[in-house]
Amino acid sequence: SVTITSYDVSSVKKDDAIAALLPESVTKDGKLTIGTNPSYAPAEFLDADGKTQIGYDMDLARAMGNIFGLDTEIVSSNFDTIIPAIGSKYDLGIAAFTITKERMESVDFVSYFTAGMGYAVAAGNPKNVDENDLCGLNVAVETGTVEEEAINKTAKQCKADGKKDITIQSSKQQTDATTAVVTGKADVFFADSPVVGYAIAQTDGQLEQLGKDFDEVPNAIAIKKGDSQTTEAVQKAMQKLMDD
């Protein structure tokens, strides 16, 4: 199986100039509190101990805490509850968020990389799933994702065209969506392309990608709406991490 090693962020040191940009509302407790949903490997997931959050988003969260000179506290939560709690419960949301118009009404974003979306089916595609015609199928997604939104639109289109209904299986955890396809409870799952690739690698030949990645969109860190100080600090910290 493929393991994704996490980076050692201990070499990332405090940058006083960047840290000074943060408002007191973020720094006063000495912690950078991050909301995430650790079921979205390889971005964020739990280590073998079932407790430690690892993945490239979590490395980013900890590196950012180091630059700010704050302890990074990562809080696990259901994906759809993170954005509403940014600025109250969490300083930042780092959970492979793609930027959407709707989300931009609630939070500000700093993007850090681009990911597409993709489908995965059981190996050999025994149900002959065609990504251009999902009507009549069971489709698994994680609740609150852009993929859930997209499949709801597709389902409406199937209805409008007088075709068979799509059954949408929406799970709080991406891992449940993946398992649904492995066990045959769902015909296909729909997720960000790095997640599809990782699930295929982790399930030892039980899954395969259907078609190619599509709709590349930026992934971004979510920040309290209108908090320009934190947004600037996050932007500068990201730039520093990319430059180093």
Can you say where each PLM-predicted feature lies in the sequence?
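Extended ligand-binding regions for polar small-molecule ligands
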Residues: 2-16, 66, 125, 137-138, ...
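Extracytoplasmic small-molecule ligand-binding "clamshell" domains
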Residues: 2-93
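Ligand-binding clefts/hinges and TM-proximal coupling segments of bilobed small-molecule sensing domains
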Residues: 3-24, 146-168, 205, 238-244
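Bilobed "Venus flytrap"/periplasmic-binding protein-like clamshell domains
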Residues: 38-41, 53-66, 97-99, 115-173, ...
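Hydrophobic residues within well-ordered alpha-helices
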Residues: 64, 85-87, 134, 181-182, ...
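Acidic, polar ligand-binding/catalytic clefts
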Residues: 71-133
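A ligand-binding cleft/hinge motif common to bilobed small-molecule-binding domains
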Residues: 81, 97-104, 152-153, 182-216
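Periplasmic-binding protein-like
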Residues: 113-121, 197, 201-239
